[in-house]
Amino acid sequence: MTRAELYGSLNQLEGLIDEYYEAQTLDPLRLAPIRDRLIALIHQENLHHTLGIQIPSQEGYPQGRVGSDAILTQFLNTADGYLCELKEAQIRDGLHIFGQCPQHTQLRDLVVAIARNPNANRLGLTRAIALDWGWNFDPLTADLGAELVNCVVPRLPPQPPLERGALIALPFGKSIDLAPSPFQGEGWGGVKTSATPKPIRIIGDAVEILEEYAAELVAKLIETSVDGEGYPQGAPLQVDGEIGINTQTELNWIATKLLPALQQTNLEMVNLLRGLNGEYIPSGASGAPTRGKPEVLPTGRNFYSVDIRAVPTETAWCLGRKAAEVLIDRYTQEHGEYPQTLGLSIWGTSTMRTGGDDIAQALALIGVQPVWDGVSRRVVDFEILPVSILGRPRVDVTLRISGFFRDAFPNLIDLFDNAVKAVAALEETSEQNPLAAQVQQEQMKWLEQGLTLDEAQTRSQYRIFGSKPGAYGAGLQGLIESQNWETEADLAQAYINWSAYAYTNKAEGIAAPEAFNQRLGNMQIVLQNQDNREHDLLDSDDYYQFQGGLTAAIKQVSGTAPEAYFGDNSRTENPKVRKLTEEIDRVYRSRVVNPKWIAGAMRHGYKGASEMAATLDFLFAYDATANCVQDFMYQGVADAYLFDESVRQFIEQNNPWVQRDMAERLLEANQRGLWEDVELGTLERLRLMVNEAEGIIESQGN
């Protein structure tokens, strides 16, 4: 794992924004040329579409209002925070090699990624540094675009603005020079800092200082703690200057706990061979180490997950309830009213990792809280929260569960089904309780169609759907891979056919297409959550199958596209929700076309090229199902993967099948009307690449 950082035009844009603000105060005559370059870059990178703020082109820009232009100022304020979010996004730097611990910069960045996150016993590295420096914001939860207020370096006379690349004072009067990097050891990539000092105006700039300093401390710690023989216990912390007590505590933990655990990555191979030989393999915890669970290290152990009777855990309930309110707030701000209906996909693997964040959120949305046993902390019941306590109406939630969730968590199916029935029986108004109102309405409908009262009541209360017993997935992957579909309606129907099986506390997998279509016809929101940043929504087909498939199905049945949201629960103390289009854009800019990620993939030959192709496939499939990809993204992928000469040569030499497949996929996107704004010359180049790749493959006898 590593920070995405900025690159190319995005890096230039950040520098120009700083110059613009500086010129407003010091040299207004420079504003016009800076503005012209800013506008050109904004349109070049399509940021005006991404941020939803229309900026006229250079030709159409109104003259005479440069210094006070409200639209441009609004854009720059928004863009500043957005660029900071992209810069601090976590992406993978290459692939894990089985049995090998990362080395050099990969090890440094992985340690920082894990140590950054707090848990019950630790502050987290960057938070500890900020606390020792007396900085009055939380780097893990603060708005990166917010103006920096009363944030000065300790033991220095107040000299705002601070500057990146200058001396950063430590709490005891010592200092460390952030640029150039002090690390000269072979294989160390220095921390990237601005060529010229940059004013620190917003919290995102200060967070970058913390991240750079944390990386330098960790790199020095690794150099003094690690040798060819392994990780000696109690390694000295030979860093320049004195370190604050909170930072020292974090560094001690890294030296004595985290680094030794990472060094034991070779246990993956050792224990695999032990298992094949019928020997004992030690057990260990499971989860995401970058989400505050470093106890899952070292890897290579026989991991255990959770006691399903304790799910959702109290910790998961806290996050789930918070995430529910964040979602409702976002929808209410955008639509001016509370949401009434929502579809949520829930997977078994994420439930195991988190202890039940998603099911907790679903319960919170309908206004139900689990009840835990006082000793075992197992879930023994639930209680209905009054609307007066909720402070909002309930939300009618329908779950689309994965096959693994169905197999692993039958107790949660029972819990949610019982909760739905209890909420449906409440005597509340339709405004307070859309779920009960919908159940009553549907019950009458089914009675009119000849069902008995019991049958009508049962069918109207179906709120958990999945694939039929023994089946897994959502039915779309085969269609996408084989190109065996004509329109979005084909994909929608495949999803419906695969998903229309109802699960209750009394029945497993009842074919219920009419009830499922009823749910789809009323659904306003499609929500997909992600619990960690060790991967993203373009790393797996599951995301487009579940969220994209549900989105397409709702559009097919109701005739209206739902609001598609993506929940980011990677920071448990600060869950966020974005529109799906925003998340796609974020992943596209931070990873997909990021030279840093591409370079990491290129270290892995054949497999690295396959990762690039898979990313394009999932981007295409998301667009086919949810219409969430902009034309410039297809062009950007073509430019980064196929039209960049060094990357093209890498792919051609290591995996010519990928060159053919990616070019064909881009051509398919154009043929299906997903990529419309494209030059004929670009399409011709892609066709030529297909032919060239076919020739290489044939010449190799494959």
Regions found by a protein language model. Give the residues of each.
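Ligand/cofactor-recognition surfaces for anionic moieties
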Residues: 1-156, 163, 167-177, 191-702
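Ser/Thr/Pro/Gly-rich low-complexity, intrinsically disordered segments
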Residues: 159, 179-184
